[in-house]
Amino acid sequence: MKSALHQIGKTSLAAALSGAVLLSAQTTHAAALSVSQQPLMLIQGVAPNMLVTLDDSGSMAYAYAPDSLVNSRNNVYFASNSYNPMYFDPNTQYKLPKKVTLSNGQIQVQDYSKPSFTAAWRNGFTQEGRVNLSRDYRPTVQYQGGSGAGTESSIDWYGAPAFYYQYSGGRGCSLTTSSCYTRVEISGAAQQQNFANWYSFYRTRALATQTAANLAFYSLPENARISWQLLNSSSCLIGSGSSNCYNNYLRDFTGQHRVNFFNWLENLSVGGGTPLRQAMTRAGEFLKKTGVNGPYAYRPGTQTSPEYSCRGSYHILMTDGLWNNDSASVGNADSTSRSLPDGKSYSSQTPYRDAASNTLADQAFHYWATDARPDIDDNIKPYIPYPDQANPSAEYWNPRNDPATWQHMVTYTLGLGLTTSLTSPKWEGSTYSGGYDEIAAGRLSWPNASNNHSNNVYDLWHAAVNSRGEFFSADSPDQLVAAFQDILNRISGKDLPASRPAISSSLQEDDTGDKLTRFAYQTSFASDKNWAGDLTRYSLTTQDKATVQTKLWSAQSILDAMPNGGAGRKIMMAGSGTSGLKEFTWGSLSADQQRQLNRDPDRNDVADTKGQDRVAFLRGDRSKENSDNFRTRNSILGDIINSSPATVGKAQYLTYLAQPIEPSGNYSTFAEAQKTRAPRVYVGANDGMLHGFDTDGNETFAFIPSAVFEKLHKLTARGYQGGAHQFYVDGSPVVADAFFGGAWHTVLIGSLRAGGKGLFALDVTDPANIKLLWEIGVDQEPDLGYSFPKPTVARLHNGKWAVVTGNGYSSLNDKAALLIIDLETGAITRKLEVTGRTGVPNGLSSPRLADNNSDGVADYAYAGDLQGNLWRFDLIAGKVNQDDPFSRANDGPAVASSFRVSFGGQPLYSAVDSAGAAQAITAAPSLVRHPTRKGYIVIFGTGKYFENADARADTSRAQTLYGIWDQQTKGEAAGSTPRLTRGNLQQQTLDLQADSTFASTARTIRIASQNPVNWLNNDGSTKQSGWYLDFMVNGTLKGEMLIEDMIAIGQVVLLQTITPNDDPCADGASNWTYGLDPYTGGRTSFTVFDLARQGVVDSKSDYSYNKQNVAVSGTEQKGLGGLTLSTNEQGNPEVCSSGECLTVNPGPNTRGRQNWRPIEGKN
């Protein structure tokens, strides 16, 4: 072959390239929900500074990597991805970039036009210079764009149909043996389009970098702060704001600034040397800048103060070459003793030191070890993913950790086409693998770097280590995309501090003789331990009038000690046969399921052949951990965040109350049989499974829902940490007894929350023979969103048992609907869709069902939506006998057609704050009988805590607890809504927050008002229709909200609120547990909580307020996940939040629970 240089006409690299791999070609909706894949309580409110440096040197025009391949340009293997990784790879899907613009203040996104195979653009961004790839293709050696004519160096003067060479390998073959390659012409519409995409957007280093950076940065949140620069352009320096660099001031990554960044990427032109050290200097010195355009300004460009001292700063440095033609002046920083800003002393040590001065590594160490802003506090969060409590010094100097609390710069370096040069120390795919151990142990030294020296390739690796960042080496376009995304995930991970344990808990009671022995199952997770989780069993006893927990076992420890790499685990998935299940093994997977697992999550889901190893990894095999394709786990058991355990032992219901529901079912016989059932505890985890454990902590069963299968492979990624976290089976399992198929069964309903859009039902009657009843996903119900709502199992008037649930959030059409699902078959019995505001995302939340006449059959359902509407649904016949409106005499399948949205399709109430803004409802309402015995008081709270933006406390408005009187609950035709507003309700307030001591127990408490509600006028007409309580103390807004289910017991309603931290430099959230009068929403007339921790509730737990002792309305408690109702050893009710239980008084003359279900947790 011959090489040719020819003119291709006027061309530049201008275009509009933008895109995220997962987005469709449709214009994005500005109001679309952003469901977080990270636990919000760990997210800080301060976004990091991100400084991006891209290489614009002349070698970025090359269509090969590494540089040495130019000498092989006339050989056939130059046109093979096996030899030249920049060349077309038939196994890689080359995704089109997207164009980002701003229209009417909203970001708009659309796909770039597909390049045609018969008229493909040489530069896909400028859409200039076309080539007919079906006949005129010539492999590119170098492509140089610019404002004038573009030039291209290519192989052979004579065009041909597009092709690649396939390496056959085999005996006697090497990558440079021409006879071992077979020429393959591009054929078929799909492959031709893929080749055209590669040719127009990926075939050179520059084009691949533009596309890869765009695909990675597209998903960066809008609150990130970003500036950018090139190596060679004097008018494109970090933070300069130059118009020639698209106004690259440091700004929030939103609006026009976001568009500017993508425009800068799209207009990248190349030419010049590789002055990496000058670029590093500009980035490091920029962090020292003060003022309104500085890196610590509150709103850069607008407002300087307050300057948050916890804001991290990261430098992303991408290059394809070795630094040259520049200088630095930091000396041999990594070999010079010095005092660090936190008082620690550094002396020359591995793996930081070397013998050379003024290297990139020296600069990286200097800008890590120097306090960029000594005038502000040192509050950067330490990042310690590898703790070493036995040796704090080793922990501090482990470069995988970043203990620096001062303002400093962490650098991530990315080399393109350099891997084959990294031989001593040897690069093996990640910063701390390969030859790194030799460096750390002192058996090898970092090669000395100097101007334009071949050793400078190691300086990129060394620099990343010295700054507590990471080095990435990519050789192909798909690796480049993955590397950029990995870097952003690592930064997000460092921005996510370690978690606290015991996020949720569930209590199990167990009767043994005349003594009540109590057990608690607590879940926990640790983001700083590679997203490990645990389920722990405790016994609960009372000592000195306080509840004491004694740890019995840890499911994590038992599972991790399991022999044979998980081979013996019973992990099931949907299958055929009588059980509806099959083993999760490689051989049992369908071809499509194998394809899904044959994807490399570290390389942008490129196809590979590691699927069988991924199955083994997910089953618990740890033999391949910490290799090129598999991460290291601290535990096989994944993080358990929002899923509360459910226990299954004896029958679920009280026999004498359940028997009349299905007279032919003989529940007493069923209940007697279940007395000997082996107890189990079920819980969902974000390792892709619902787990079942016995009472000794042994895993006996696991189930992988089909709705999470598509992203199972992500769990194996080396980059699965921090911001790469995904939710999987994150919902709380719901267990109930139900009658179908002529028999009673115990069923488990599973949901996923942010893990996916799906529901499933398992028959767990026999724990040794569990059956899958059904699964539902978007294919079966398009309006199913993320399954945040908690399902309810109920007998309905159509004569069938059903699962009743809200449709969830972020569904296809963003609608809200109540789903009624046949429990036995999974068929949708009815979908009751509600109205809402157009253009505003909606979704129905968890429902609460009402059984008006206590016959065990649901008559009404209540649920709220994201637009703040409280809905009622009539689950009764259209026409009823008013003398006996809920009679079961007319029950039958036809009744289902009469199920409807009450009040003519209008809400019972629409929640808005004092300014008229809608208040989202995401927790299930609670119901109490109205004191007049007419209807219900429907109690519900407002607040939303699942989008990324919800992590920061919203102190601009109040969320509210409401009690609304629904008077029309006797089966009458409720054809019109009461149309209530706040003006129809009695206001209550939180009047006091104080620190106090109750019999030596220190607490922070709150006192609510006690305003009476005047329900009726003298003539019996309605005067007030309820009450409301804004969550603020003396008018002070903290962002408090209600997102967990409440508990109504006796004459008190118990609830727990959450308040995201209003300090942007702190993670976490605070919680308040309230006990309020359900009839007024205010302070109770009796003492509710045993704040003195004496096992009973009396006046010792009162508080002196306005010269009298009053009941405390709320107390601050630790732990998230809502409240669990139980009983203590004295038989008194208590409410538990994670580790603390408080005895509660439900009020005087309180009757027993009027419900045919037993006390929660009773077996």
Swiss-Prot record:
Coiled coil: none
InterPro entries: PilY1_beta_prop_dom, Quinoprotein_ADH-like_sf
Impact after mutating D859A: Loss of calcium-binding. Significantly reduced twitching motility. Dramatically reduced level of surface T4P. Regains ability to produce normal levels of T4P and is capable of trafficking to the T4P fraction
GO MF annotation terms: calcium ion binding
Location (main, coarse): other
Amino-acid positions noted as binding Ca(2+) 2 in the UniProt annotation, renumbered to this chain: D851, N853, D855, V857, D859
Leader peptide range in chain numbering: 1-30
SUPFAM superfamilies xref list: Quinoprotein alcohol dehydrogenase-like (SSF50998)
Keyword Aminoacyl-tRNA synthetase among record annotations: no
Gene Ontology cellular-component annotations: cytosol; membrane; type IV pilus
Annotated positions binding Ca(2+) 1: D600, D602, N604, D608
Extra information: Residues 600-608 comprise a calcium-binding site which together with the other one (residues 851-859) seems important for interaction with integrins of the host.
Protein name as catalogued: Type IV pilus biogenesis factor PilY1
Species of origin: Pseudomonas aeruginosa (strain PAK)
